[in-house]
C-alpha cells in the first residue's frame, strides 16, 4: 500500500508540479477539499484559488490554480487547469494590474462581458492572495 499520493498539476502548456505528497488541499467549486492516500476516487471541478500540498519531506507548497478539474484516485491526484503558478513565480504587480483592469471594466458597464470580467477579477484576487500568503 502506498504511503503517499502522486500529485500532477498540468496546464495546456506544461506540467507545473509532478511530486509525491502526503496531503493535498484544493479549491473545489463546492468548497476546499483535502485528499490523503487511499481516498475514495472522484472527479470534481475546481475554481480559481490556492492549492496547498505537503511533500514527503514535510515541506509545504502553495500554488495558484485557475478553473479546471481534479481526478482523485487512491494513489494519485491529477489537476488539469488552464493556468497554475507557484507562489514564488507570481508577479504581484501584474496581478494587481489585472485586478484594477477587471474592476474598471466592471464599473464602466459599457459593452462589458460581465461573466468574463468577473472571472478575470476572481483570478486576479486569488493570485494576489496566494502571492501574499
From Swiss-Prot:
Keywords: ATP synthesis, Cell inner membrane, Cell membrane, CF(1), Hydrogen ion transport, Ion transport, Membrane, Transport. CDD domains: F1-ATPase_delta. InterPro entries: ATP_F1_dsu/esu_C_sf, ATP_synth_F1_dsu/esu, ATP_synth_F1_dsu/esu_N, ATP_synth_F1_esu_C, ATPsynth_dsu/esu_N. The keyword Transport applies. GO terms for molecular function: ATP binding; proton-transporting ATP synthase activity, rotational mechanism. Pfam families: ATP-synt_DE, ATP-synt_DE_N. Its main location: membrane. It comes from the Bacteria. One of its GO terms (cellular component) is proton-transporting ATP synthase complex. The keyword Manganese does not apply. Gene3D superfamilies: ATP synthase delta/epsilon subunit, C-terminal domain, F0F1 ATP synthase delta/epsilon subunit, N-terminal. It is a peripheral membrane protein. It is found in: Cell inner membrane. F-type ATPases have 2 components, CF(1) - the catalytic core - and CF(0) - the membrane proton channel. CF(1) has five subunits: alpha(3), beta(3), gamma(1), delta(1), epsilon(1). CF(0) has three main subunits: a, b and c. Belongs to the ATPase epsilon chain family. Produces ATP from ADP in the presence of a proton gradient across the membrane. This is ATP synthase epsilon chain. It comes from Desulfosudis oleivorans (strain DSM 6200 / JCM 39069 / Hxd3) (Desulfococcus oleovorans).
Amino acid at each position: 500500500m502506498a504511503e503517499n499520493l502522486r500529485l500532477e498539476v498540468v496546464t495546456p502548456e506544461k506540467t507545473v508540479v509532478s511530486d509525491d505528497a502526503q496531503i493535498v488541499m484544493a479549491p473545489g467549486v463546492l468548497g476546499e477539499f483535502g485528499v490523503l492516500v487511499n481516498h475514495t476516487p472522484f472527479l470534481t471541478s475546481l475554481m480559481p484559488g490556492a492549492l496547498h500540498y505537503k511533500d514527503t519531506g514535510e515541506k509545504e507548497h502553495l500554488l495558484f490554480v485557475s478553473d479546471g478539474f481534479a481526478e482523485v484516485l487512491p494513489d494519485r491526484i491529477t489537476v488539469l487547469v488552464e493556468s497554475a503558478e507557484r507562489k514564488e513565480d507570481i508577479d504581484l504587480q501584474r496581478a494587481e494590474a489585472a485586478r484594477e483592469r477587471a474592476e474598471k471594466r466592471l464599473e464602466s458597464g459599457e459593452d462589458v462581458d460581465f461573466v468574463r470580467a468577473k472571472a478575470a477579477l476572481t483570478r486576479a484576487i486569488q493570485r494576489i492572495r496566494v502571492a501574499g500568503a
